[in-house]
């Protein structure tokens, strides 16, 4: 028995793209053969899934896509109260895959049949014990030895041969070959023939056109051309009130996130990766306390860059530039959203906004009972006929962005399709000191959108409608 790996995912792969394991086995043509794929939490006996697969038509390979299973094991990380850094264990799942196989417990013989005390003895390695019911199939389908064909009982057995309850005197040709199997079609199961260990599925989804060229080396932060786990453009405009929580896949241990502003001043925050993925707040409103002289952002700073630093004197990731947007706004709402690679970025909505409320209620008509006084029926003017209950209030907002670049407009699609979105309002004191409300979960109401191109529209802005996920309570 041997297996060959035909294909497997890369060790670090997004959970929302195909994660196919394809195996070949030398036993694939055996009767009742199936591949067994077992999936475990890495390094443990905690089995999260098991699949038995028939060989593919044509090549006989065993193929299993584990993406649906692993999607149930990843979620997202977000801590809006932290401005330092934190490990992001919910954004990834470590797993092992062990591939085995099963087949019908079938044994063949080619040696001559032997007389064993008047009964037929067959020479073949086997696992039978006395009393087992077996089915014998001869090469000639029982033409020469019809009494040996079919269902019989084992009356003696060793690991090398076995005897069945068939009189040897009925045998006319001792040279006929054949096979024998348990009457209940018992299977032989062999597990852990091929093992894949310490694979990582992270909360990510690549576009159809991008997935075929995906390489995990693009996201392992070791060189200046490596990317964080985000699709946020390398140049991105943010207001002073915006938050960014970006994920990265760095080496474990003590590292630095370096900030350099347009005046050339350099700052950093130390991180200590204990997990495969870390989340780092890097937005203008949430970069936190940095080591350096002065402040990262003041009235003279137009932009700042942020990158990952591991090796002394080296740049270990792309530089992500944050251009500071100081355009005065009528009112500002910021929407924080989960992007396609598991980071939380945000867009500011600085132009006119409209807040609307919707009330739903149940109304029923009740009989006015009134009262009897002085042998006359009467009622109070406060008595109610129509009554209402189950009153619910929901809030929605129409929001409009300011002008943005084409790259930002394309990235905006990820906000519109994000399953996790949060909104906050921002006010500015003297234009430079933002004060924010707390984040509230919301739902994007837009069901269609246009992807703008600058060749068709020089000035690009977006409009959306959101609805708060939670309703205010109404007393009765």
Spans of model-derived segments:
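A short local loop/turn or secondary-structure capping micro-motif enriched for an aromatic residue
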Residues: 130-131, 170-174, 246, 276-278, ...
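Short solvent-exposed strand-capping/beta-turn motif centered on an Asx-Ser/Thr pair
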Residues: 125, 249-253, 404
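Preference for solvent-exposed, low-hydrophobicity sequence contexts
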Residues: 1-108, 183-326
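Extracellular/virion structural assembly segments
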Residues: 2-5, 271-272, 297, 313-476
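Surface-exposed coil/turn segments at beta-strand junctions on protein surfaces, enriched
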Residues: 88-90, 157, 299, 392, ...
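Beta-strand secondary-structure signal
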Residues: 36, 96, 121, 133-135, ...
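Internal, charge-rich low-complexity segments
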Residues: 104-110, 114, 358-361
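Small/polar beta-strand repeat architecture
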Residues: 109-133, 137-185
């Amino acid at each position: 028995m041997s297996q060959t790996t035909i294909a497997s995912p890369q060790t670090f792969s997004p959970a929302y793209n195909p994660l196919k394991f394809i195996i070949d086995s030398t036993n694939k043509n055996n009767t009742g053969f199936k591949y067994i794929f077992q999936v475990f939490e890495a390094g443990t006996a905690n089995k999260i899934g098991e699949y038995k697969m028939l060989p593919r038509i044509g090549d006989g390979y065993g193929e299993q896509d584990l993406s649906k299973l692993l999607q149930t094991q990843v979620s997202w990380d977000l801590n809006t109260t932290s401005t330092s850094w934190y490990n992001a264990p919910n954004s990834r799942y470590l797993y092992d895959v062990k591939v085995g196989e099963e087949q019908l417990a079938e044994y063949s013989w080619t040696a001559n049949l032997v007389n064993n005390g008047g009964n037929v003895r067959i020479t073949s390695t086997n696992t039978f014990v006395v009393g087992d019911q077996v089915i014998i199939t001869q090469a000639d389908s029982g033409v020469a030895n019809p009494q040996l064909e079919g269902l019989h009982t084992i009356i003696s057995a060793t690991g090398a041969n076995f005897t069945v309850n068939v009189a040897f005197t009925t045998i006319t040709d001792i040279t006929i070959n054949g096979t024998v199997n348990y009457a209940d079609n018992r299977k032989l199961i062999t597990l852990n023939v091929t093992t894949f260990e310490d694979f990582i599925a992270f909360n990510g989804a690549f576009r159809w056109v991008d997935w075929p060229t995906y390489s995990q080396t693009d996201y392992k932060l070791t060189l200046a051309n490596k990317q964080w786990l985000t699709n946020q453009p390398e140049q991105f405009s943010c207001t002073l009130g915006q938050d960014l929580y970006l994920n990265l896949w760095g080496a474990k241990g003590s590292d630095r996130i370096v900030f350099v502003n347009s005046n050339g001043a350099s700052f950093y925050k130390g991180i200590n990766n204990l997990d495969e993925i870390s989340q780092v707040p890097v937005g203008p409103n949430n970069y936190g306390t940095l080591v350096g002289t002065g402040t990262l952002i003041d009235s003279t700073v137009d932009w700042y860059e942020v990158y990952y630093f591991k090796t002394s004197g080296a740049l270990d990731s792309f530089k992500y530039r944050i251009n500071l947007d100081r355009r005065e706004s009528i009112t500002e709402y910021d929407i924080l959203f989960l992007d396609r690679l598991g980071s939380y970025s945000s867009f500011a909505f600085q132009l006119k906004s409209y807040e609307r409320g919707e009330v739903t209620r149940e109304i029923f008509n009740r009989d006015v009972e009134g009262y009897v006084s002085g042998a006359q029926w009467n009622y109070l003017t406060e008595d109610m006929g129509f009554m209402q209950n189950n009153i619910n209030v929901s809030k929605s907002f129409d929001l409009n962005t300011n002008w943005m670049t084409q790259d930002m407009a394309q990235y905006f699609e990820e906000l519109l399709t994000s399953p996790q979105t949060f909104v906050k309002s921002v006010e500015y004191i003297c234009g430079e000191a933002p004060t924010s409300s707390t984040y509230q979960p919301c739902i994007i109401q837009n069901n269609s959108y246009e992807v703008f191109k600058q060749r068709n529209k020089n000035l690009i802005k977006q409009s959306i409608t959101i609805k708060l996920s939670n309703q205010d309570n109404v007393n009765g």
